[in-house]
């Protein structure tokens, strides 16, 4: 059974305890599952508890996708001076919008002012200067900084005391398990009792519960596996509405995750290219397997193609490798090559003949 666990691709939601870093949790999950392909989504500070989504296997390639989703927290902040409930609600209303944030000194990113959106900010309970609150915010929002800013704007001063993450996108607190639970479930699975483990292991499609979905025709699957984008002729059906620029999920007719990418048209008006993939997960029948599209790698450096054209014209298309066809066709005279080089500014490498 342990061999099957090591081949699984999906997510496990860990209820991170107070104390260890997120990277320490990564290490422990690797040790428990016996696999190296493990990564967390959304780093939590050592003193913060709650939802830490662990991506397993191929799902590590979806970390950047899930990380885009909003996060929810329940926290405790302390005001430095007496403040009424109405004053708390009023200052919370002021922050339920787009705000400017400067990351703290101890952060994993550069200290540049950023714009983040606070979708919800509510007071749950108040006792004296202590306020229990709930916040739903854009990914990358620093709650400790938010509490400090709230205290400053209120004129009372304030700081965060405690914090717990309760959701990352579709991954909620109620499906989280402790590291001890995970170890126990894996031990049971080794004995052939894998029901508990499988009930808490989430398929990769779980990350796209709230995304619009496109089902591709069987005839399009092999093309997608070889890196092709999805065109209108390969669309079988659409579940949900989307607009150009939205992220969409592409499934097979058997509900297998083929890939995800950016829509190039509206769902109400499909035209030519429908999805521009940035992640492809389906394996080709006769290929190298999974494909992760990186558009930047397809961009050529200035002069790169010009250099190739001159080289091919002078020495034949296979001159760089010395392999291939013996007959290269008509060649340009050396003086013509020099003129082309002077005109374009592209010259042969030293030592070339």
Swiss-Prot record:
SMART domains: DKCLD, PUA. Residues 309-328 have a biased composition (Basic and acidic residues). Residues 211-287 form the PUA domain. The active site is at 45 (nucleophile). Keywords: Isomerase, tRNA processing. Could be responsible for synthesis of pseudouridine from uracil-55 in the psi GC loop of transfer RNAs. Residues 292-353 are annotated as: Disordered. Residues 336-353 have a biased composition (Basic residues). GO terms for molecular function: RNA binding; tRNA pseudouridine(55) synthase activity. One of its GO terms (biological process) is box H/ACA sno(s)RNA 3'-end processing. NCBIfam families: CBF5, PRK04270.1. Its EC number is 5.4.99.25. Belongs to the pseudouridine synthase TruB family. Type 2 subfamily. It catalyses: uridine(55) in tRNA = pseudouridine(55) in tRNA. This is Probable tRNA pseudouridine synthase B. HAMAP family: TruB_arch. Transmembrane segments: none annotated.
